[in-house]
């Protein structure tokens, strides 16, 4: 989250300086010479697990970095999601009880009943 905040703040700051001109960069396409003190940071995007998406709404402009593995997993789970109308449920039916059968049973294993004992000065709760 800290990286995203720093990256967002940097991009917003750079965007606000739109009237400034870029410094001339010497070199060809394969090698670029940039002053070391002007570098803010470097993020290697060569891996397949990082994707960059541009974000633009009424208040924010910037780049969003996401983990592609998690995005693909979420998309596959949402494709398998069944909505209310498609859910597999048992059909409606009347409840039937045998003689002496309770309406529901408690699932938890409760401790057997016993008297409470308190030490001197011990609170009730």
UniProtKB/Swiss-Prot annotation:
Signal peptide: 1-22
Disulphide bridges: none
Residues bearing attached sugar chains per UniProt: 57, 67
Presence of keyword Phosphoprotein: no
A Gene Ontology molecular function term of the record: mating pheromone activity
An individual GO BP term: mating
InterPro entries, per the entry: Mating_factor_a, Mating_factor_alpha_C, Mating_factor_alpha_N
Gene Ontology annotations for the cellular component aspect, listed alphabetically: extracellular region
Pfam families: MF_alpha, MF_alpha_N
Record bears the keyword Glycoprotein: yes
Record keywords: Glycoprotein, Pheromone, Signal
Name of protein: Mating factor alpha
